[in-house]
C-alpha cells in the first residue's frame, strides 16, 4: 500500500479501508465458497489436504498480485481449513527484530502467520525471519559489546503467509524461502457478477442480474471494489425506496459517485485529461505529471496508472507516459497527429 500523501481518499482504489472490514459476512469462510482464482484455489486445496493428512504445517506461502484480490481472505481460509490459529500483521508494523520475535514466540504448532506488505520489512527484521522460516528457530543476540551472546530459541513449526503487491522489491533470499508461490489475477466479469449477487443477498437487498452486471463491470476486476460499490449503490436504492437494485439504479448511483462506464473515477479522468490537453497526449515524464497533478509520484505509479495501463489507455515508454487512441475516444477528444519521433519504440515496463 502506498502512503498517499496529499491524494484524497478514492472510492475506486483497491487498497484496504476500515469500511471494507465492516461487512465481514461478505467474505467467504471456506475454500469451496471462494469465487475466482481457480488455479490458485485448486492448488491450495491440494497442498492443504496433503498437509492435513500428514499432520504437518503447510509450507510457507507467498501471495503476489494487485491489492483487493483476496490475499488476506485466502490466508484466513487456509488457517480455517487447517484447523489452526491465525495471526495477522504487516511489514511496516514490525519495526524491529524484537517485535517479530514476540509474534513468533507466541505462535502455536502449525499456526498461520500472515504478513501483509512483506516487501516493506526492515532488513534487520528480515534477517531474523530467515532461520525462523527455514529451521524454525530464532537466532538472537542479547547484550552489547564483549558481553553480547547469541541465543537460539526453538519455534513451533508454523506457516508464514506473505502477501505483496510488488514482488520485485522482495529480496532473493526471502523469496526463495517460500515453497508455495501463488500469483493472483484480476477477476472476470462473470466472477464479479456472482460476487455482487451473493453480497447483495447477504446484505439483505434484492438485485437483478442487470444491476449486478452494471456494478461488476465498473469494479476494475477487483472484489474489494465490487463490495464497496455494492454498499454505496445499496444506499441509493434504499434512499429511493427501491426493493431491488436494477441497472438504472446502479447506473444512476455510480454516475453520481463519478464512476463512469469503464470504472474510471475523477482522478483517472483528470490524469488522462492533463496528458491530453496539456501535453498533446504525451510523451510526458512521471515527475512532470506528478507536479501537474499535485500528487506524489509513487501514488501515481502505484494507485492511478495500473488500471489505466491494464485497460490500454496509457503506455509507459522510455520517453514518458503516452495516451492511446482508446484514451482519446473515452475522453471524447480528437487525437492529435504525432510526429514519428514521438511514437513509442517499446514499453518501459513496470
Curated annotation (Swiss-Prot):
GO terms for biological process: DNA recombination; DNA repair. Homohexamer. Forms an RuvA(8)-RuvB(12)-Holliday junction (HJ) complex. HJ DNA is sandwiched between 2 RuvA tetramers; dsDNA enters through RuvA and exits via RuvB. An RuvB hexamer assembles on each DNA strand where it exits the tetramer. Each RuvB hexamer is contacted by two RuvA subunits (via domain III) on 2 adjacent RuvB subunits; this complex drives branch migration. In the full resolvosome a probable DNA-RuvA(4)-RuvB(12)-RuvC(2) complex forms which resolves the HJ. Mg(2+) binds at residue 72. Its main location: cytoplasm. It comes from the Bacteria. Pfam families: AAA_lid_4, RuvB_C, RuvB_N. DNA binds at residues 297, 316, 321. This is Holliday junction branch migration complex subunit RuvB. ATP binds at residues 26-27, 68, 71-73, 134-136, 177, 187, 224. Residues 188-258 are annotated as: Small ATPAse domain (RuvB-S). GO terms for cellular component: cytoplasm; Holliday junction resolvase complex. It is found in: Cytoplasm. Residues 261-350 are annotated as: Head domain (RuvB-H). Has 3 domains, the large (RuvB-L) and small ATPase (RuvB-S) domains and the C-terminal head (RuvB-H) domain. The head domain binds DNA, while the ATPase domains jointly bind ATP, ADP or are empty depending on the state of the subunit in the translocation cycle. During a single DNA translocation step the structure of each domain remains the same, but their relative positions change. The RuvA-RuvB-RuvC complex processes Holliday junction (HJ) DNA during genetic recombination and DNA repair, while the RuvA-RuvB complex plays an important role in the rescue of blocked DNA replication forks via replication fork reversal (RFR). RuvA specifically binds to HJ cruciform DNA, conferring on it an open structure. The RuvB hexamer acts as an ATP-dependent pump, pulling dsDNA into and through the RuvAB complex. RuvB forms 2 homohexamers on either side of HJ DNA bound by 1 or 2 RuvA tetramers; 4 subunits per hexamer contact DNA at a time. Residues 4-187 are annotated as: Large ATPase domain (RuvB-L). Residues 1-23 are annotated as: Disordered. NCBIfam families: PRK00080.1, ruvB. Belongs to the RuvB family. It catalyses: ATP + H2O = ADP + phosphate + H(+). GO terms for molecular function: ATP binding; ATP hydrolysis activity; four-way junction DNA binding; four-way junction helicase activity. Its EC number is 3.6.4.-. The keyword Cytoplasm applies. Keywords: ATP-binding, Cytoplasm, DNA damage, DNA recombination, DNA repair, DNA-binding, Hydrolase, Nucleotide-binding.
